[in-house]
């Protein structure tokens, strides 16, 4: 080498970290970084190398970015280059913050192409997820022919490397697979200073510039790498940082535990101001302590941040209750993916979303292209090809079960006095049976429509000649027919005095039923049923006091039915309207108000359309 080269090695500055939710602690991290840069300018080093985690978050605030650019500009003024790699905390899917600083001339991003500082070539590898370490590609490193023969080569990485604690990567493996001989490997991610030799290469961690946790009790530092013709030297420089004070107060079971704790705290009054204080309370656990009072007392003594921990052990409980083991996050994700049993498409989507090589703006496009490629590769004509569809947990309903349950039941509701007629059987006759039991006139109740049977059960019941069964729901909506039948059976005050009177009542009932049916005109789109071979007949039931409708013992001739209908011709509908005269045994409908919307035809007809006469009975 022509001359001695000095490079400042730092890492894990974690700028923007608001530790313990304290703005003062956020400023402390910037002050530590400023100290490093100030020392670099004062020592006139040849370059500053940052080994990852410049920021604590991949989304630093605008204030953090402005302060960082302000600090880096001091190096630019001093003509000292700043080189860095991307750490795991700040890694983004697309453009990195180092790329922005490089465009501004404030920094350079290290990679497989070397950055030259005199006769020293510096390479870099960004933080690699643990799951991708076995697949890392060592090819692509550039070794320019213009490099001098005695050129020294440095590699900068952000990984936990073996032989450090909890390693992710074997440093010896990396050095062996590199296409060049590395004189030193400058590392980040481990926050303590380390320096070891692996083979012929030096491996060193500079440590973090500020304490990221209470466990980091050692002084913070950075390193100076000195390269010359005689060899390589690594020296450590510490950084002054805010004091972390650890106090242990023991309670021995007296009545005044607070006095014991405050007495112990008072022994450190000179160290408490502007310090981050950690107080552990140990000893007897019988007394109840208010930690808020202890924190307020320490803050009153000038502490910046106070953390109180109850380290007392309750009687009968061993000190080690549970052993906690922390698993690798990447391994946990892999186990969760195996548990989910994703298909090929799901695995492709997961891989694209979590890949750092796919920019966020191209996730949708890349996912679509990969899935289309998967679909095109599938041979749908393959006889072994099969699409699995989850089976519903709902048990199928057997239509015959409803019918069988009805047939097995010995009791039939009084309202089930109307025999069902299949719409597909025009030759069947609708027969209205006489109720088996009739209540006294004073005990008459309003007849409620039972829950209608389904169409399947309705058809099956007719085919099996079962007991009476209500038709489907469309019959329940027939307001006019239901109202007429209900009011006929409720009219108990009309009692015939003679068979002649009873006969007139039967005729009136027949007329009322015919009047209701005649409302269904061809204009409404209703298809009337053809003439049945077994017409409806009416019989007299003088024992019950009113006329009931029952199946005839003998079928009357059409002439008799015609004579009965002509007897009440004056009560037949004229021009589609009922007569205003009240038929015997039929409630007066003239007093019932009709809604205006019904007159104008704004609402649907009460009688369903396109059903035959059997549906209405």
Curated annotation (Swiss-Prot):
Gene Ontology biological process terms, A to Z: double-strand break repair
Region described as Disordered: spans on this chain: 395-437, 513-617
Activity regulation (UniProt): Nuclease activity is regulated by Rad50.
Coiled coil: none
Note on cofactor: Binds 2 manganese ions per subunit.
Comp. bias regions, Basic and acidic residues: 560-583
EC number: 3.1.-.-
Biased composition (Low complexity): 395-432, 549-559
InterPro entries tied to this protein: Calcineurin-like_PHP_ApaH, DNA_Repair-Maintenance_Comp, Metallo-depent_PP-like, Mre11_archaea-type, Mre11_N
Family recorded in the similarity comment: Belongs to the MRE11/RAD32 family.
Record text on subunit structure and interactions: Homodimer. Forms a heterotetramer composed of two Mre11 subunits and two Rad50 subunits.
The protein's name in its UniProt record: DNA double-strand break repair protein Mre11
């Amino acid at each position: 080498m022509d001359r001695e080269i000095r490079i400042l090695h730092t890492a894990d500055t974690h700028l923007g970290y608001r530790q313990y939710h304290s703005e003062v602690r956020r400023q402390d991290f910037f002050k530590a970084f400023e100290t490093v840069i100030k020392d670099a300018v004062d020592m006139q080093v040849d370059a500053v190398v940052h080994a990852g985690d410049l920021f604590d978050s991949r989304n630093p605030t605008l204030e953090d970015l402005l302060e960082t650019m302000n600090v880096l500009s001091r190096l630019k003024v001093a003509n000292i280059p700043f080189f860095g790699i991307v750490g795991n905390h700040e890694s983004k899917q697309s453009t990195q913050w180092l790329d922005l600083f490089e465009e501004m001339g404030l920094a350079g991003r290290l990679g497989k192409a070397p950055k030259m500082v005199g006769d020293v070539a510096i390479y870099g590898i960004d933080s690699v997820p643990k799951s991708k370490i076995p697949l890392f590609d060592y090819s692509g490193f550039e070794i320019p022919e213009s490099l001098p023969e005695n050129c020294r080569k440095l590699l900068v990485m952000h990984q936990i490397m073996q032989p450090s604690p909890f390693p992710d990567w074997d440093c010896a493996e990396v050095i062996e697979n590199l296409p060049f001989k590395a004189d030193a490997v400058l590392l980040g991610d481990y926050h303590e200073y380390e320096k070891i030799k692996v083979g012929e290469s030096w491996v060193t961690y500079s440590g973090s510039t500020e304490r990221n946790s209470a466990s980091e009790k050692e002084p913070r530092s950075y390193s100076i790498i000195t390269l010359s013709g005689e060899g390589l030297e690594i020296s450590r420089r510490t950084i002054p940082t805010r004091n972390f004070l650890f106090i242990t107060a023991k309670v021995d079971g007296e009545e005044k535990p607070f006095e014991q704790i405050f007495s112990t705290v008072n022994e450190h009054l000179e160290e408490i101001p502007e310090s981050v204080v950690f107080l552990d309370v140990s000893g007897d656990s019988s007394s109840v302590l208010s930690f808020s009072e202890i924190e307020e007392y320490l803050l009153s003594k000038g502490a910046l941040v106070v953390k109180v921990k109850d380290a007392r052990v309750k009687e009968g409980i061993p000190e080690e209750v549970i052993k906690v083991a922390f698993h690798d996050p990447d391994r946990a994700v892999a186990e969760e993916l195996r548990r989910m049993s994703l298909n090929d498409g799901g695995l492709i989507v997961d891989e694209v979303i979590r890949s750092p090589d796919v920019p966020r703006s191209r996730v949708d496009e890349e996912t679509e292209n990969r899935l289309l490629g998967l679909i095109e590769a599938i041979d749908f004509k393959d006889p072994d090809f099969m699409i699995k569809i989850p089976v519903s947990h709902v048990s199928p309903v057997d239509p015959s079960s409803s019918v069988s349950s009805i047939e097995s039941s010995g009791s039939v509701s009084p309202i089930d006095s109307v025999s069902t007629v299949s719409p597909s059987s025009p030759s069947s006759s609708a027969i209205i049976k006489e109720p088996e039991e009739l209540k006294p006139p004073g005990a008459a109740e309003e007849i409620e429509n039972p829950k209608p049977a389904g169409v399947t059960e309705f058809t099956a019941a007719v085919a099996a000649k079962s007991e009476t069964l209500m038709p489907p729901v469309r019959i329940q909506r027939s307001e006019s027919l239901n109202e007429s039948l209900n009011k006929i059976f409720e009219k108990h005050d009309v009692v015939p005095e003679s068979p002649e009177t009873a006969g007139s009542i039967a005729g009136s009932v027949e007329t009322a039923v015919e009047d209701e049916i005649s409302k269904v005109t061809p204009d409404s789109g209703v298809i009337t049923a053809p003439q049945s071979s077994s017409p409806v007949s009416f019989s007299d039931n003088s024992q019950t006091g009113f006329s009931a409708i029952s199946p005839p013992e003998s079928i009357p001739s059409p002439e008799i039915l015609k004579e009965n209908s002509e007897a009440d011709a004056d009560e037949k509908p004229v021009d589609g309207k009922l007569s205003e005269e009240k038929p015997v045994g039929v409630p007066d409908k003239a007093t019932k108000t009709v809604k205006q919307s019904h007159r104008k035809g704004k609402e649907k007809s009460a009688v369903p359309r396109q059903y035959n006469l059997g549906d209405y009975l």
